[in-house]
A protein has these predicted regions:
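Catalytic beta/alpha-barrel core
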Residues: 1, 5-6, 12-22, 35-46, ...
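Core segments of cupin and vicinal oxygen chelate
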Residues: 145-183, 205, 212, 223-228
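Vicinal oxygen chelate
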Residues: 126-127, 139, 181-187, 211-229
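C-terminal helical cap(s) of enzyme catalytic domains, especially alpha/beta-barrels
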Residues: 29-33, 115-137
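Glycine-enriched alpha-helix->loop->beta-strand junction motifs that scaffold or abut catalytic
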Residues: 10-16, 30-37, 51-56, 77-81, ...
């Protein structure tokens, strides 16, 4: 309702998410300067939302309406539309949703179950929320980098590791790799002796998350493909 939206904004809300699509509520929220994310389930509702100038809509209930496979099909005609799936999203399928680049975020009550709130079990809510963040980021050890002084030194070290452990040898432009697990750089890189590379499912989300811990990333070291990924 208008009253609920007003109270949410007065309480400091910066965006409004609704279960369904009500054009009147969307227009009212936009008139108040709110970022509106209404619930949609059909192409018709999505087109109405786009006609109002929205670029992001909620997809609800997600699993019952076909899940990420449905959204990938809808992405054909709606290439610029972004989605926020909720409904049936949980720790087991969260990564599958977020792997699709037209999904900006996911929501789910599995992190804040009603009984946990009633029991004031904040520790369990915290654990589930942290688990969701870890799942979203998908951090894993990618490789260890070793600084070498020359291409010959890098080649020699990589071949030694490959011979000793049966790793696959791969020559690259700036380094030589042993099974993608060890990168021997052809010239000294960052770090005194080398680096530890941590992989993530989303660089932008990882940069934001690490920033909360005081980690500063160097933008000049970022490499992207033709699509900016």
């Amino acid at each position: 309702t208008h009253d609920q939206l007003d109270r949410a904004l007065d309480a400091g809300a910066r965006f409004i998410v609704s279960p369904g699509f009500n054009p009147d509520m969307v227009r009212y929220g936009l008139s108040k300067g709110a970022l509106m994310v209404p619930g949609t389930a059909t192409p018709g509702e999505m087109e109405q939302a786009m006609a109002l100038g929205l670029e992001v809509v909620k997809f609800f209930p997600a699993e019952q309406n076909g899940g990420v496979a449905k959204l990938k099909a809808l992405a054909g005609p709606y290439k610029t539309l972004k989605w926020m799936p909720t409904g049936g999203v949980n720790a087991k399928n969260l990564a599958d949703y977020l792997a699709f680049d037209q999904i900006v975020a996911c929501g789910g009550t599995w992190m804040v179950k009603k009984d946990l709130i009633q029991q004031e079990n904040w520790a369990e809510i915290t654990r589930l929320s942290r688990e969701a963040v870890r799942t979203m980021l998908g951090f894993s050890l990618d490789h260890v980098g070793i600084n070498c002084g020359s291409e010959a030194e890098a080649d020699r070290l990589a071949r030694t590791l490959c011979d000793m452990f049966g790793f696959a040898y791969q020559m690259g432009n700036s380094s030589v790799q042993a099974l993608h697990a060890v990168e021997c750089t052809k010239a000294p890189g960052r770090g005194t002796h080398g680096h530890i590379a941590i992989a993530t499912s989303n660089v932008d989300r990882a940069v934001y998350h690490l920033g909360l811990y005081g980690v500063h990333c160097l933008p000049e070291t970022r490499k992207t493909d033709a699509k900016g990924k």
